[in-house]
């Protein structure tokens, strides 16, 4: 019944995206146990970017400020679009790691911070265009990063 509601009113992809983010958090939990024992530096870059993306998901999506005028209530459609942006960043970062791009270049603090703050910086109405702009910004950043890496 709830799946039908999501399919009809939000997107058929919502539950798949939710499952992907749950898996990300589960893997992050396992990796954090290793990190506590031996430190993050011993992890390969694909696992380190997973930890970074879990931080983005936790801070940018799961943490809620009930006293904030925008964050106290977030429409389900906006939540879905927020998850899409986080997923876009995660997929782009994973592809960059596979191309052997340095983690310090992949983890652009300004871009990651902008994604974390989307729930505050994008209002709860008329948000489609802003999410499209942010997704384009992510795409453009990683495209440029990949092109620069290919030239080196």
What is the predicted function of each stretch?
Residues 1-152:
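Conserved catalytic/coupling modules of large nucleotide/cofactor-utilizing molecular machines
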């Amino acid at each position: 019944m709830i799946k039908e509601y999501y399919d009809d009113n939000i997107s058929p992809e919502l539950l798949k995206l939710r499952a992907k983010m749950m898996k990300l958090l589960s893997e992050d939990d396992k990796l954090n146990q290793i990190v506590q024992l031996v430190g993050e530096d011993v992890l390969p870059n694909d696992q380190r970017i997973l930890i970074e993306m879990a931080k983005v998901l936790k801070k940018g999506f799961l943490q809620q400020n009930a006293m904030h005028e925008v964050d106290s209530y977030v429409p389900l459609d906006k939540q879905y679009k927020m998850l899409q942006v986080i997923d876009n960043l995660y997929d782009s970062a994973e592809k960059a790691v596979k191309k052997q791009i340095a983690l310090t270049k992949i983890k652009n603090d300004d871009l990651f911070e902008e994604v974390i703050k989307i729930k505050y910086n994008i209002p709860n109405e008329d948000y489609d265009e802003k999410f499209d702009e942010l997704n384009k910004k992510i795409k453009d950043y990683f495209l440029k990063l990949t092109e620069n890496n290919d030239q080196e």
